[in-house]
C-alpha cells in the first residue's frame, strides 16, 4: 500500500512539475510575442489624438475624421480587422489627403458584440443615416482589412448605397466567428436577425499546439483546411458579383 502511495505521489509530482513548466513557457511566450503598442480597441487613444468627432448610435461606434484642406467629393468608411480597431491609422492618412472619413468599430465596444461573432450587418444602416443627417454627398467608399474586408464584401452585396469598396487581404467566403466557442460555433455576421451562412473553422493540430503555447501562428493553413472540408462552400460564398 505504501509503495503504491509513493508511486502515486511521484506521478502527481511529475504532473505538477510539467504543468508548472508549461505555464512558464506560455507566460514567457505571451510576454515575448505580445503585440506592441496600445490596445487597438481602446477608443480613448483615438480621441486623445484629437481632430476627430465621436460617432455613436444603437450599435454604431467610431469617429468622424473631417478632411484636411479642401475636401474631396464623397466619404470613406474604414474598418479594421480581427484586432478590433477602427483602422485609425488609415483614417488619419486619408484625412490628410483631403477625404472625409468615418472610422468605425464593428465589435468590441460598449453596446456591440463583445467578440467577432454574430456581428449584425444591419448596423451599417446607422452609418448611412448618420451620413445623410450630416449632409454628406458624393460617392461612398468602404474600406476594410482582413476580417474587416470580409465585412465590407458582405456589406457591399446588401447595401446599394455603397459605390466603391477597397479590401485588403479579403475573403471570398464568410467564415466562422472568432471568439469563445464554449457555446458552439457561429457565423461572424448576421443579417436581419439570421446568421450569414459560413465556413466552419478546422484548425490543424500544429496550429492548435502553437496557439496553446502562445507562439506566433499563421492561419493560412487553417483557412485552407476549413475551406477544403466545408460542407457547403457555395452557401458561404459572398456573391460579390452582385455588387454593381
Locate each region found by the language model:
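N-terminal Sec-pathway targeting helices
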Residues: 1-20
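N-terminal cap/lid segment of alpha/beta-hydrolase-fold proteins
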Residues: 26-71, 230-236
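Short beta-strand element of the alpha/beta-hydrolase
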Residues: 72-81
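Conserved alpha/beta-hydrolase
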Residues: 96-111
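Catalytic nucleophile-loop/oxyanion-hole region of alpha/beta-hydrolase
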Residues: 108-137
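Alpha/beta-hydrolase fold nucleophile elbow
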Residues: 135-146
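Short glycine-enriched nucleophile-adjacent loop
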Residues: 149-160, 165
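Accessory cap/linker subdomain of secreted extracellular hydrolases
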Residues: 166-243
